[in-house]
Each structure stands twice: as C-alpha cells, then as structure tokens.
C-alpha cells in the first residue's frame, strides 16, 4: 500500500516526465 508521500512523489515524477517529453517533442518539431 502506497503512502500519501510516495504517491505524490510518483505523481510529480510522472508529471515531470510528461512535461520533459512534451518540450522535447516540440523542440524536435521546430528543428524539422
């Protein structure tokens, strides 16, 4: 069972990964 702290940490990790992937894709699209 996950605690609230680990759940929030996992949520922020997923959010950061999604934002990083999104900005990475936009940079690649601009280079094309």
Curated annotation (Swiss-Prot):
Origin superkingdom: Eukaryota
GO terms, molecular function: electron transporter, transferring electrons within cytochrome b6/f complex of photosystem II activity
One Gene Ontology biological process: photosynthesis
GO cellular component, one term: cytochrome b6f complex
Membrane spanning residue stretches: 4-26
The keyword Chloroplast belongs to this UniProt entry's keyword annotation: yes
Organism from which the protein derives: Tetradesmus obliquus
Oligomer status and interactors: The 4 large subunits of the cytochrome b6-f complex are cytochrome b6, subunit IV (17 kDa polypeptide, PetD), cytochrome f and the Rieske protein, while the 4 small subunits are PetG, PetL, PetM and PetN. The complex functions as a dimer.
Keywords, sorted A to Z: Chloroplast, Electron transport, Membrane, Photosynthesis, Plastid, Thylakoid, Transmembrane, Transmembrane helix, Transport
Stated family: Belongs to the PetL family.
Compartments (UniProt record): Plastid, Chloroplast thylakoid membrane
Disulfide bond sites: none
Known function: Component of the cytochrome b6-f complex, which mediates electron transfer between photosystem II (PSII) and photosystem I (PSI), cyclic electron flow around PSI, and state transitions. PetL is important for photoautotrophic growth as well as for electron transfer efficiency and stability of the cytochrome b6-f complex.
Name listed for the protein in its UniProt record: Cytochrome b6-f complex subunit 6
HAMAP family: Cytb6_f_PetL
Membrane topology: Single-pass membrane protein
InterPro entries, per the entry: Cyt_b6/f_cplx_su6
